[in-house]
């Protein structure tokens, strides 16, 4: 027993010696760790400097790439604009052909209506003539009937008087019967004649009523056509205020058909001032993205064009069309003098759109004077009709839709950038936490190995349990940790963004 105790003490002393040796090795290891940490800190400083340089070079590369992308986008945009302009030119040419065809068709329909009106007028004249003749014939028949009645009445009276004179003395019942027999044919003839007169009168009244109904229908058609012609004439050659209001209504209807909203995309009769403080009221101010504007005028006079449409011969028509072109040029000169594009608060191109509400008036003017468009263009006034204005208005509506999309895209991009930066910060912090956990796990496994390994302390002190009665506890089972923290995968996120490095520096501070 003493030998065992001595051996145990000897083993314990050896164990203490080993523990001291381990402690000395640990101290040396800690010194090496301090040395390596100092070296690592120097390497970390150099690594930070290298990262800063790489970030600077990456920034320059990104800026150069952005400039290259910007130039490429501008080239692409110019190509797209060229393609759009070509397509618009083709579309405008097709629309012009379609408008000319519509004008020809409308002109043919107008000629057909005029021919129909002429035919109806002739029929009305013929019906009036027929009615007059029938009334004259009826009056003659009435006169003839009255004459016949008077003649028969006179003859009957004469006959009755003569018979009465002859038979007055010997008048008897037989004579009375004979007189009745004699007068009966005359009475029947007079009654039949009166009946026929009444029938003729009834038929004449019915015929007159039907004729009057037909005449009323013809008159109503003529009045309706006359009213429509008066309305068109009033719209074309009415007072300036009426004509201006009509043009504004047509223009505002075109704006609404293009999907534009008043107060948001355009304003009517806006009150503006020029540099001298004079008041100006443009018909319509069209709002464009980037706080820009486009002015449209709609007060074009069409009196001369209305006269040309109603001209009786081609010479008068040509003269009135020349007056129509002169009126257009006068209005162009007036708009050019007003210089709407330089009004205070206006960011408008140096031209004004001059809207001609009647499409045929625009087409006839262009056919009569092909240089008319260039005349307005040189004075910064662009002539447009409903057909040519609608593509412009639809383009403006599309620009507003694109503007809304760009604003939403910018907002989404800003929010996405913030979210991405936050994810990078979280990934960086998770990486640090993972490194700390890996280091703690490594130290834990080393300590467990030293405690429960083949040469660990547990195996060496297990014998103390048998030697001491107080050793009543059971040594718990301590196992190594085998779960590795994959913090390297987070380095991909941190390396992809140049913002991660400044954020990491801020976090470290």
Swiss-Prot record:
Taxonomically, the superkingdom here is Bacteria
Q: Which InterPro entries match?
A: DNA_recombination_RmuC
Identify the Gene3D superfamilies for this entry: 1.10.287.1490
Q: Pfam families given for it?
A: RmuC
GO BP annotations, alphabetical order = DNA recombination
**Which segments does the entry list as coiled coil?**
1-167
- What PANTHER family does the record tag this protein with? DNA RECOMBINATION PROTEIN RMUC
Q: What does this protein do?
A: Involved in DNA recombination.
Task: Give the protein family.
Answer: Belongs to the RmuC family.
- Can you say what this protein is called? DNA recombination protein RmuC homolog
Give the originating organism: Pasteurella multocida (strain Pm70)
User: Which lineage ranks, top first, belong to the organism behind this chain?
Assistant: Bacteria, Pseudomonadati, Pseudomonadota, Gammaproteobacteria, Pasteurellales
């Amino acid at each position: 027993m003493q030998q065992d105790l001595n051996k145990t003490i000897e083993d314990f002393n050896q164990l203490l010696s080993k523990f001291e040796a381990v402690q000395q090795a640990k101290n040396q290891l800690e010194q090496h760790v301090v040395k390596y940490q100092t070296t690592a800190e120097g390497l970390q400083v150099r690594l930070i400097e290298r990262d800063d340089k790489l970030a600077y070079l990456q920034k320059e590369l990104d800026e150069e790439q952005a400039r290259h992308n910007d130039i490429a986008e501008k080239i692409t945009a110019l190509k797209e604009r060229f393609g759009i302009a070509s397509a618009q030119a083709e579309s405008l040419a097709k629309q012009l052909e379609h408008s000319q065809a519509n004008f020809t068709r409308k002109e043919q329909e107008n000629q057909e209506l005029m021919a129909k009106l002429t035919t109806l007028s002739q029929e009305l004249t013929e019906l009036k003539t027929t009615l007059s003749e029938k009334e004259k014939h009826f009056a003659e028949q009435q006169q003839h009937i009255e004459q016949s009645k008077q003649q028969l009445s006179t003859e009957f009276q004469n006959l009755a008087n003569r018979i009465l004179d002859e038979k007055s003395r010997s008048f008897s019942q037989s004579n009375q019967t004979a007189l009745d027999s004699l007068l009966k044919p005359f009475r029947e003839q007079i009654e039949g004649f009166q009946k026929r007169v009444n029938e003729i009168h009834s038929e004449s009244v019915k015929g007159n009523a039907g004729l009057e109904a037909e005449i009323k229908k013809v008159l109503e058609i003529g009045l309706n056509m006359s009213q429509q012609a008066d309305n068109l004439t009033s719209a074309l050659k009415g007072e300036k205020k009426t004509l201006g209001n009509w043009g504004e209504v047509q223009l505002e209807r075109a704006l609404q058909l293009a999907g534009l909203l008043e107060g948001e995309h355009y304003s009517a009769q806006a009150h503006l001032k020029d540099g001298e403080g004079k008041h100006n009221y443009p018909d319509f101010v069209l709002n464009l993205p980037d706080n820009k504007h486009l002015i449209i005028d709609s007060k074009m006079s069409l009196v001369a064009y209305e006269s040309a449409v109603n001209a009786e011969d081609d010479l008068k028509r040509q003269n009135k069309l020349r007056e129509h072109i002169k009126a257009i040029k006068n209005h162009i000169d007036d708009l050019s003098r007003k210089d709407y594009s330089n009004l205070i608060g206006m960011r408008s191109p140096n031209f004004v759109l001059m809207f001609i509400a009647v499409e045929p008036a625009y087409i006839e003017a262009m056919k009569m004077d092909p240089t008319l468009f260039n005349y307005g263009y040189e004075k910064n006034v662009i002539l447009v009709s409903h057909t040519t204005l609608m593509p412009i208005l639809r383009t403006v509506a599309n620009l507003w839709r694109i503007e809304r999309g760009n604003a939403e895209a910018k907002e989404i991009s800003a929010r996405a950038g913030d979210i991405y930066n936050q994810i990078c910060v979280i990934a960086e912090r998770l990486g640090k936490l993972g490194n700390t956990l890996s280091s703690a796990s490594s130290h834990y496994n080393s300590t467990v190995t030293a405690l429960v390994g083949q040469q660990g302390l547990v195996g060496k002190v297990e014998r103390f349990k048998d030697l001491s009665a107080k050793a009543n506890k059971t040594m718990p089972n301590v196992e190594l940790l085998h779960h590795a923290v994959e913090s390297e995968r987070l380095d991909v996120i941190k390396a992809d963004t140049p913002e991660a490095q400044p954020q990491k520096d801020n976090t470290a501070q």
